[in-house]
Regions:
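Extended substrate/RNA-proximal surfaces in nucleic-acid metabolism proteins
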Residues: 1-105, 166
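Charged catalytic cores and adjacent phosphate/nucleic-acid-binding surfaces used
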Residues: 86-180
């Protein structure tokens, strides 16, 4: 299951996951302080400082997600890079903090194909290449996911994931490394 993560809801999330019996759980940050990290949230009235503060808060929540150890997998770690108003605001410091938290806790980041195909406006994956390299520098391995919300999304996204893995030489962890 993929589940939203908010630091204030960690106790409720833990209770839910303990009783739900899922084989594994993907945690993702979709909202920060009541605002969407998705491209349909407007930041038009926000200046650079407010946008940077939102990005900082987003990555604080991502680090909190990893440190909570509630989830096996960290989903689309750099979701905010999809947002035109936030794209390019992820810093090396953000990437290092997230990678260090994943390395320390064993939370496995997902190479996610949700930015590709009909739903995505890019031919890119999550995380972006600088994030992939930072994870690799920290010895963090990956799982892969299509983020398919419709069966028709699988084929093209699987092809894109295969090309990416072949190009980068990344050997993802098998599902058995996540389950159980």
């Amino acid at each position: 299951v993929e589940m939203d993560y908010a630091p204030a809801a960690a106790t409720a999330i833990e209770s839910f996951l303990e009783t739900a019996g899922f084989d594994y759980a993907i945690g993702s940050v979709h909202y920060v302080d009541g605002r969407h990290a998705f491209p349909f949230e407007s930041f038009a009235d926000d200046g650079d400082a407010a946008r940077d503060a939102f990005v900082d808060a987003y990555y604080d929540a991502v680090v909190s997600l990893a440190e909570s150890e509630l989830f096996d997998v960290l989903g689309h770690v750099d979701l905010i890079e999809d947002h035109p108003a936030l794209r390019g605001r992820t810093t090396d410091a953000h990437r290092r903090r997230v990678a260090a938290a994943c390395a320390e806790t064993g939370t496995i980041p997902e190479i996610n194909a949700g930015r590709t195909g009909d739903r995505g406006e890019f031919d890119d994956l999550h995380p972006a290449p600088p994030f992939v390299e930072t994870f690799r520098d920290h010895g963090v391995r990956f799982v892969v996911g299509t983020d398919a919300h419709d069966p028709g999304d699988f084929t093209g996204r699987l092809d894109r994931l295969d090309r990416f893995l072949e190009t980068t030489g990344i050997e993802p962890l098998p599902l058995s490394a996540v389950v159980g």
